[in-house]
A protein has these predicted regions:
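Periplasmic N-terminal accessory/gating domains of Gram-negative outer-membrane beta-barrel systems
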Residues: 63, 87-244, 263, 270-277, ...
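Extracytoplasmic gating/loop element in the C-terminal half of outer-membrane beta-barrel translocons
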Residues: 667-672, 759, 853-942, 946, ...
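Transmembrane beta-barrel wall of Gram-negative outer-membrane proteins
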Residues: 250, 280-360, 378-406, 588
């Protein structure tokens, strides 16, 4: 099957490259040509000219309806000239064409001499009356002017409707992954492209991205809905339009410096009373970028190159080195990239790009970690992205393209020096991680170390036939990749303490989490992810309809390999596991745009699209028997030495038995609840479930209020299908009422917030001892819906000034009430009954030139805290109960038995979490952030120098970013673990030539 499919893909690639061409998912100029009587004019030569085009001009001829369409235009300033024998030439000048925008330019031609030219200079249209795709574009002026962290995510948080899992203040989070989401789609459903070529990473099903040097971008577009058949996923579709160099030597140097001495403090007395000794902060941020472009051969071969050094050293809240100094997460990135653009002939163009990124991180840690021992050190992580694309304009109507791109990310997360100990030695047993679950913190060691090596390769080709009224596209994309890992840990476990009762960290031993380490090199393979699409966009008077179909094949597998024995697992050898998954699905797309008044100023848009869930190797990883597995077991520190003692013996056939009797000398770990197949099989079985998909529809109206100012109102709804559920077949009950499951017995606990009784279910000892046989399968009763309402505006104010922003109201509701294997999951399972509010956000950003060469820019955003971001996994507020020891608080409302033990010592499992507040109904605090920037431009001939002053979080918001615990019984419940970066002041400069 795989060989046959690859043959089909190769044939499709060849056919597409040899067939008529494609629009490169960039911009277009379209319109209708008429004479002064209103009659349409066929045969008019329409020429678009711009310095942004290496070939200088692109021309087409209007069709029998007087319509024309010029596609695959780079963003830039254009002039459009209309010529026909017997008529005066007509020219529209100074048209600023943004990325991913279809600009309508109509022409009325007068009878006269061809040598006569009527030139009209006016404001470019701001409403796209041809496409239903919702697009927001940041041009180079906005990228340089608006204060951000200069990452694709940091810039993305300016876009209405886009949410980040963590806010980025002044680039303080630019060294680590932050994740964008929109319209209820997971972060893996984002598509990241350079010049229309996919450069997503492979890790986390494509959610993890490289660290792109923003100097390479001419513009960056963010599309969030109405995406056509040329793209698989329905999340944020991000396209970086590259700088190409040009016919004139040009370059720039940008620098920024933000030291901790210039940062304020937002650590309030309330946080200090909670035990937060220090807030978040920066040690320093340093950013220096050099870029140079120009011609190697004028009009034939251009180059662009850039080098960047970017360092962010963050203070970690409530973390100190042994000498008393604040804990610092020290890290830097070095980037070197180059791009070549070659106009091979009048019809063919080749572009190629390579970016090498090296990343270092000295102390990967969180609040209350012991920096010298518990931090993770990233050794020589290396990221490589590249891309090459050949495009051909065979005739004004026939265009082709084909290319290759890849994303390789290799990194090692290791213990700090001298923490790793030789396996099996006394030090190895003694130097395990200690985790304080109630009060927060790690010490003695990290929980483990690992290497990760994801690699993703992409080939794609496409073609289109373009007339004035039609744009027929067809194309194919083929991706493959591998993801290899290793994992190891001192002691093959970490120790968990819950010390809320004493208030003294690491004083109450609770449990151990054992691991199936060591894991030698193991991995998963994306055999193929293939998509073939066909789409036609056609215009009938004021109506433009786009219909398309996309068909996709996706196949992954687990690689076969071996690993040696560990403390809790025998030596293991597993064969490859194939077809996890093996999917083939259609994804139809439909949209319509109506030019309401025929003046290109008001557009009514509708879209109805199916988006398949993005996957790479995530499913294969879930069924890899070598996946990193953990199991929580009860631990009693009998001798009080802080070292968890005990192990397992293995027979020749791989079966096991405890090496000693629990609660005797040297035997402190209770293995009675350890599943029989721990570490020797994947805990989950693949149920061959179908691919999850989302049916999204949107209605939007866009109107140009006055020249250069447009407003947009929109509504979007998503309905997710083929959602899955994990069922442990050992505890499965087929009866109608899961509360009658014979593997469970009911017992009553009390809500510590209200005193109301709650029925929970104890697993029988016989059921608890059964092996874990998790089956992942489709759940026909599980539902997820998403609704959003947006109001946006965008203003081009002249002289480079711009302002954009708006409101977004969004809500996601989940119904997940299938409880055939565990009736405890019925609690808080239906969001339609959980009073989930709409999450609200407002954003505004822009830049404005002032007299004397001064430019003012800034952004303001207010949004729900991280736990209120739709489309992300949020945390339920719960009671964490350990059997036989956890007690009701003294102030528990009646009829709650205050002070009593909540669960008996015989309860199974050993710990139980009882949700009291639904995750989607809980918000931490609103994040309100105001960032401003002032710069002064000094011009010296062709050289300009602009010193700048930046201030981030001017309002000095102290909103919580994370909490110590969501366990309502903990004394640290909802206490701040980290807070917003306080007010941050920085200086910088831009030198351009």
């Amino acid at each position: 099957m795989r060989r046959r499919l690859l043959g089909m893909v190769a044939a499709a690639l060849a056919c597409v490259v040899l067939l008529p061409a494609v629009a490169r998912a960039q911009s277009a100029i379209v319109g209708v040509v008429k004479d002064t009587s209103g009659a349409v004019l066929p045969g008019v030569t329409v020429e678009a000219a711009s310095d942004a085009l290496i070939e200088k001009t692109r021309s087409v001829v209007s069709d029998g309806n007087g319509q024309y369409r010029i596609v695959d235009l780079r963003p830039g300033s254009y002039s459009v000239t209309f010529s026909l024998e017997g008529f005066q030439s007509f020219k529209r000048d100074a048209l600023d064409l943004p990325a991913q925008f279809t600009m309508t330019i109509n022409a009325d031609m007068k009878v006269g001499s061809l040598e006569e030219t009527l030139t009209v200079t006016g404001d470019a249209p701001t409403v796209d009356v041809q496409t239903a795709v919702h697009t927001s574009v940041l041009n180079r002026e906005a990228i340089d002017a608006i204060p951000t962290g200069r990452t694709i995510q940091g810039m993305g948080q300016l876009i209405v409707g886009v949410s980040l899992n963590l806010p980025d203040t002044g680039g303080a989070r630019a060294m680590q992954q932050t994740y964008m989401s929109t319209h209820g789609m997971t972060t893996a459903n984002n598509t990241v492209m350079i010049d229309g070529m996919i450069v997503n990473g492979l890790q986390s099903d494509g959610a993890v991205q490289s660290y792109f040097n923003d100097a390479m971008n001419q513009e960056v577009s963010y599309q969030t809905s109405g995406i056509g058949a040329e793209t698989s996923s329905g999340g944020v579709r991000l396209n970086m339009i590259p700088r190409e160099g040009g016919n004139r030597w040009n370059g720039d140097f940008k620098s920024a410096y933000r030291p901790h001495q210039w940062q304020g403090s937002n650590l309030s007395d309330a946080y200090v009373k909670q035990g937060l000794k220090t807030g978040n902060g920066i040690d320093r941020i340093v950013d220096a970028t050099l870029a140079q472009g120009g011609p190697i051969m004028k009009d034939r071969l251009w180059f662009f190159a850039s080098a960047r050094y970017f360092s962010v050293n963050n203070f970690i809240a409530d973390t100190q080195f042994k000498d008393g100094s604040r804990g610092v997460d020290d890290q830097f990135i070095r980037s070197a990239l180059a791009r070549l653009t070659w106009q091979i002939s009048s019809k063919w163009k080749l572009g190629a790009y390579q970016d090498e990124i090296d990343k270092y991180r000295g102390h990967d840690m969180q609040s209350k970690y012991e920096p010298e021992t518990a931090a993770i050190q990233w050794f020589s992580p290396a990221y490589h992205t590249n891309q090459a694309k050949l495009t051909g304009t065979l005739t004004p109507r026939l265009l082709v393209e084909g290319g290759f791109s890849s994303n390789l990310e290799y990194y090692t997360n290791s213990y700090r020096p001298d923490v790793e100990k030789p396996r099996g030695t006394a030090e190895w047993y003694a130097t395990t991680n200690q985790t304080e679950a109630d009060l927060g913190g790690w010490r003695r060691a990290a929980q483990g170390q690992n290497t990760q090596s994801p690699a993703r390769y992409n080939w794609q080709a496409s073609a289109s036939y373009v007339t004035g009224s039609h744009n027929i596209k067809t194309g194919v994309q083929y991706q493959r990749g591998t993801f290899y890992h290793t994992v190891d840990a001192n002691g093959d476990l970490y120790q968990v303490y819950r010390s809320a009762s004493t208030g003294i960290p690491y004083s109450v031993a609770d449990s151990v989490v054992i691991r199936n380490t060591p894991l030698a090199k193991y991995g998963e393979r994306l055999n193929y992810d293939v998509g073939i699409f066909l789409q036609d966009t056609f215009t009938m008077k004021r109506l433009t309809v786009s219909g398309g179909i996309r068909y996709e094949w996706l196949n992954s597998q687990v690689e076969g390999t071996s690993s040696p024995a560990g403390r809790f697992v025998p030596a293991r050898t597993f064969a490859a596991v194939k077809n996890v998954p093996n999917w083939h699905n259609a994804a139809p797309r439909l949209s319509a745009v109506y030019d309401l008044f025929g003046n290109s100023k008001t557009a009514l848009k509708y879209s109805l699209n199916r988006y398949n869930q993005a996957r790479t190797t995530g499913i294969a990883s879930a069924y890899n028997p070598f996946q990193s597995q953990t199991q929580s077991l009860a631990w009693t520190d009998l001798n009080g030495d802080g070292i968890a003692q005990g192990g397992l013996n293995f027979n020749a056939d791989g079966t096991r038995q405890p090496a000693c009797v629990y609660r005797t000398a040297g035997c402190e770990i209770d293995f009675s609840t350890l599943p029989a197949n721990f570490g020797i099989a994947s805990p989950n079985q693949y149920g061959a479930y179908p691919r999850t998909w989302n049916l999204e529809q949107g209605i939007e109206i866009q109107h140009e209020l006055i020249p250069r100012l447009s407003v947009t109102g929109s509504w979007f709804k998503g309905a997710f299908h083929n959602l899955t559920r994990t069922l442990n077949q050992s505890w499965l009950y087929e009866g109608a009422d899961p509360r009658q499951n014979p593997n469970y017995t009911p017992t009553t606990v009390y809500n510590v917030l209200t005193g109301a009784p709650i029925t929970v279910y104890a697993r029988t000892a016989a059921a608890q001892a059964l092996p874990t046989r998790n089956l992942d399968t489709i759940d026909p009763n599980r539902k997820r819906t998403y609704n959003a309402f947006n109001m946006e505006f965008r203003a081009r104010l002249g002289k480079g000034a711009q302002l954009f922003g708006g409101f977004a109201f969004e809500r996601q509701l989940d119904v997940n009430c299938t409880a055939a294997d565990n009736p405890n999951t019925l609690l808080m399972c239906d969001d339609t009954k959980n009073d989930v509010p709409f999450s609200k956000q407002f954003k505004v950003a822009g830049n404005y030139p002032l007299p004397y060469g001064i430019q003012f820019s800034g952004s303001f955003q207010t949004s729900a805290g991280p736990n209120g971001t739709p489309g992300t996994i949020t945390s339920t507020q719960y009671m964490a109960i350990t059997r036989g020891s956890t007690r009701y608080p003294a102030n528990c409302p009646s009829p709650c038995p205050a002070g009593s033990v909540i669960l008996p010592s015989t309860f199974q499992p050993a710990t139980l979490s009882v949700p009291l507040i639904a995750p989607s109904a809980y918000f931490i605090q609103r994040i309100n952030q105001l960032d401003l920037k002032l710069q002064k431009n000094f011009q010296f001939g062709r050289i300009s120098f602009s010193p700048q002053l930046e201030v981030f979080n001017i309002n000095n918001s102290d909103a919580m970013i994370s909490v110590v615990t969501n366990n309502i019984l903990s004394s640290s419940y909802r206490y701040a673990n980290s807070i917003m970066q306080p007010r941050m002041i920085g200086v910088g400069a831009q030198l351009k030539w």
